[in-house]
Amino acid sequence: MALLLPLLPLLVWAAGPPGPLGPPEHSEPPLPAEPPDALFAAGAEAYARGDWPAVVLQMERALRARAAIRARSVRCRLRCANATAVVPTDGLEPTLHDLLFFRGLLRRAACLRGCGPTQPSRYRLGEELEREFRKRSPYNYLQVAYFKINKVAKAVAAAHTFFVANPEHVEMKQNLEYYQMMAGVRESDFADLEARPHMTEFRLGVRFYSEEQPAAAVLHLEKALQEYFVADTECRALCEGPYDYEGYNYLEYNADLFQAMTDHYMQVLSCKQGCVTELASQPGREKPLEDFLPSHFNYLQFAYYNNGNYEKAIECAKTYLLFFPNDEVMNQNLAYYTAVLGEDLARPIEPRKEIQAYRQRSLMEKELLFFSYDVFGIPFVDPDTWTPEEVIPKRLREKQKVERETAARISEEIGNLMKEIETLVEEKAKESAEMSKFIREGGPLVYEGASVTMNSKSLNGSQRVVVDGVLSAEECRELQRLTNAAASAGDGYRGKTSPHTPSETFYGVTVLKALKLGQEGKVPLQSAHLYYNVTEKVRHMMESYFRLEVPLHFSYSHLVCRTAIDEKQEGRSDNSHEVHVDNCILNAEALVCVKEPPAYTFRDYSAILYLNGDFEGGAFYFTELDAKTQTAEVQPQCGRAVGFSSGSENPHGVKAVTKGQRCAIALWFTLDPRHSERERVQADDLVKMLFRTEEVDLLQETSAEQEPTAATSTAGLHAAGKDEL
């Protein structure tokens, strides 16, 4: 925190000379009479009853209302930022710095409040509806309605607009093919009504560049840059919203003033850095354009050269080199332009000032974000490839280097192993294609005493395994005692009714919470350390058994006990946890699983490690996608682990615990380090501090002859909600 505090005085705002605080005099234009969610719902209802003019009216109003609210929010935030200009604090007493800082915050807040709606929640879109607008769903309704009222040109534009963002939509593709064959439909009718100006201009510039029309290329690329910074300003302004709690974290969030400010400000900065990706993304395309902003100057320097403008060519080359100073080709180009123009004329030409300012601001933001990643465990994934290495703290650089080297080594060795397996598969020509799924499985468990009891074949599925002997009887008892002790100490969700059934209670503890309670002497510290080590043990077993090419990262983990409520068991027909899929929303009637939020789409593998079997019910079972046809059942017992991939191939549930208490460690993993658990980073650091060792004790059990497994991830992001297996 100490490195952040000196920066605070630089952020002081004031709205003119000292004076009384008050709301701004300026007021924004009125908000739409109806919020976009109500208009969208009205349009959908009109569609259902076939009232096509009403569909057009309501959906068009919904689109305009959402755009107006967003534009109003951007205008308001930018106006308030401009009205509270930065003032230097040099020469002031140090004791006044904090007061001036918060005085500026109050002025900004008063300004924002003055232009906000009287009922802000009425105009705030929920996640689901925001997703519908991002998917351009209103245009799906509109294209049908326009066609029904014989406005074919508008129908074509709406269909094209929807298809640009949904290129896999088969029906819309067929509609567009039909429109192309219709008489009177022009090519210009196929317009993207949601096209972003900066991307449109960039594409035009690149097209003219490819067609060797440098003058036209320059015109559109320069326009693209202007529009880019307009879009960047708007995107960054929209980041300054309320704090986004992750899952159920708000129930346990407990931070002091500076921790809360840090958490929120880092979230805002991370969002603003994410505008780089947002502005480089194209609807319907999975990956954004790499190095999007610098690439403008790569095109421009050569276009200006072909146009005979060496001054501008030098300016753009030097600007590009701000991002990639060691680019060999660009340095050669710059040397050539300088030689042609002359050293005396070329030397005074500087990179563009607005790009210098952009780069400086971006690097300062990255320094703060990497610092918070290193010190507080708040993850940050840099969207740029041009960031200088020295911006990243040395300790974090070393961590990332070790992770990359370990991942590369494991990938290479697994690749060699897979080549051997592929050779075996080719030799067995008579085996079915399904066999390849099982061949990937079956790697060593890497720990003595552990053995595979059931594999995918015996569990009637794919990417499934049951392992016994993961824990000893004494370790199971010790971890059960830890759960009860942590519940007595209080961890935020002890003794609550289960979120999945009113007939059971549950309580539990996360790894970090257990370690903190151990540090405070409220639970045995060695038991908390055992809990940490056991989760690492399961992770390494999963990586090795499923022969994963990249490391697994913890997405969420907790030790939880479910207890049957005796008086609520009579006539009980529900499950302890109904059938579900861990990374998608299961629609059992349609036999589909939709991989989109609010599902935890980033989860790739799941595991549950049982601590006991002395209870009634509580069996774990797999089903088909219909959630009814059971394919396999696993009875819990001490030291038994069930591991499986988290996708639609593995719907699963937990049968009712009808008597006694069932305790287990539930673990979810991700292959994407951006979604790894923030608490895990803090737990890793706490273990190193408490036990003064660089390696977890259990890792020493792995013999030198066995296959290497993935290194422990030190990346971290958010803790998911308290969901259970």
UniProtKB/Swiss-Prot annotation:
Short sequence motif Prevents secretion from ER: positions: 722-725
Subunit structure: Binds unfolded collagen in a complex with CYPB and CRTAP.
Tissue spec. comment: Expressed in embryonic dermis, tendon, cartilage, liver and kidney. Expression in the kidney is restricted to the calyx. In the liver, expression is restricted to the interlobular septum.
Residues given in the record as Fe cation binding sites: 580, 582, 652
Domain Fe2OG dioxygenase: 557-671
Pfam families registered for this protein in UniProt: 2OG-FeII_Oxy_3, TPR_leprecan
Gene: P3H1
Region feature (Disordered): 701-725
UniProt TPR repeat ranges: 36-69, 136-169, 198-231, 294-327
Active site: 662
Family: Belongs to the leprecan family.
Name of the protein: Prolyl 3-hydroxylase 1
Gene Ontology biological-process annotations: bone development; chaperone-mediated protein folding; collagen fibril organization; collagen metabolic process; negative regulation of cell growth; negative regulation of collagen fibril organization; negative regulation of post-translational protein modification; protein stabilization
SUPFAM superfamilies: TPR-like
Physiological role: Has prolyl 3-hydroxylase activity catalyzing the post-translational formation of 3-hydroxyproline in -Xaa-Pro-Gly-sequences in collagens, especially types IV and V. May be involved in the secretoty pathway of cells. Has growth suppressive activity in fibroblasts.
Cofactors: Fe cation; L-ascorbate
